[in-house]
């Protein structure tokens, strides 16, 4: 779940998983050549430990294994002039009888927040989830103190189903809740 969210509006696009273009960046499926740029986004977000439940010392190899998804999931990027500004990933939230519900995560490089990138990544993933036949999307662990992300996901139709109290140990403010958020597709 994104937690490096932004709140700026993004131009409307068709409901398709094809590459989407905004006034200033494109969102498209990631390629192997995008990995260095994806890692440049992931690493600082993970190291701060404020918005994702990953270990702060996650290695590049571990991150790649966890972030890069296979169909029906996918990994995607927001790019401008060949520079990866942000990235997202989409996958089934559970296996078996729960595999019809999607889960996604998003990260935006700190230098590019406030440009509508997280909104565009989320919109892309919602379209991709619909196209892949998912019936809903669930975010399992939106950090309660990440109010920008919480606001953004709510503005995009997600609702908070529950909050697990003190489930996240924020490195600066201590224990905070994790929201479970949901949207029917």
Give residue ranges: language-model regions.
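Conserved GNAT acetyl-CoA-binding A-motif
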Residues: 129-142
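Acetyl-CoA-dependent GNAT
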Residues: 13-16, 29-32, 55-111, 122-124, ...
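Conserved acetyl-CoA-binding loop of GNAT-fold acetyltransferases
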Residues: 154-164
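Terminal substrate-recognition subdomain of acyl/acetyltransferases
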Residues: 2-23, 106-107, 164, 170-185
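A short beta-loop-alpha structural element at the N-terminal edge
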Residues: 26-38
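Conserved acetyl-CoA-binding loop-helix of GNAT-fold acetyltransferases
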Residues: 114-129, 151-155
